[in-house]
Amino acid sequence: MVDPATGAHTTSTSQMATAAARQALERAGVQADEIDLIVLSTASPDYLLPVAATYVQQQLGLEDCAVIEVRAGCVGAVQAHDIARRLLADGTYTTALVIGAEAVSPLLAPVFLGRDPERVRMRDRLTVYTFGDGAALVLRAGEEGSAHGRPRPVFATRSLGGARKPGMLIVGGGTDAPLAEQQRRPRLMDIRLDIPGTAQFGPRVFVEGIHDLLTRSRLALADLDACVLPEGNAEYFASEYAAAGLSPADQATLSKTIVENLTDVGATGSAAVPLALDAGWREGRIRPGDTVLLLAIEASRYLYAGLTLTWDAPFPGH
């Protein structure tokens, strides 16, 4: 995390993830040594190797723990959630931290630090003003589903952008070119957004995801108590629902259930869904027994990942 005023690098992805983990453990009254699985999603790890999840393990003081890292943006936290859910359900592990964490500011700092804001290109301003750093997680324990008389969770994920250029491309640090060649580029790291493409195609990805999850889970929109979709009420997004195939009646039903906090935290990649979920829970919009849909849309290759579940965490402080 980079301080936008001073340019000082203050916090890494794993440090943010660990801070969120400690907060969750304290809320739940769980000791760190009870954790036997960490599943972390990020597109901005501390290093290529070791994976950031192992640094969370280290910072929590866990000598021995299973770790899995999902390399993804917005969809990663939902994918990580399903991985952990399955491993807990079959008894492989007992208690898991499912983390989404993203530190985007170190990638964006060269765009604006020490520069006159008026001389920053408009497309770069959109990137700087849109993204944020963050980390959030779900602490999961035990088996769920039919053993408790509830519907089993349903998961689905797809990439709809196999024949399209990426809606988001983060360049640098990969193997597309030798490092010496990468260092000759104007920026070692760069985020490139296809703003028109994402505005036009993004809502279609969302609508496809909604229909897919409802079909697989045999639920109707009216059955959902909450739809955690970080960008669901964004004007540029919601204005395209009709063109993407969502009826006005379904739009009205959906808008009453959407839980998001984009205007509060910005676009936070892997952290977006768990941050919105946490906000909805703390605000009382998500209550024990609610049927919840977690749905993430990622512009990189126009992916979605969704998971239906029954929320059973008590209100904060209870």
Regions found by a protein language model. Name each.
Residues S14, T18-A21, S44-P45, E63, ...:
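Claisen-condensing/thiolase-fold acyl-transfer catalytic domains that form or cleave C-C bonds
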Residues E34-V39, Q58-R71, D116-R123, A252-N261:
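Glycine/charged-rich beta-loop-alpha catalytic/anionic-binding loops adjacent to active sites
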Residues R71, A96-E102, R140, L294-I297:
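Short beta-strand segments
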Residues A89-F131:
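Flexible, glycine-rich active-site loops centered on histidine and acidic residues
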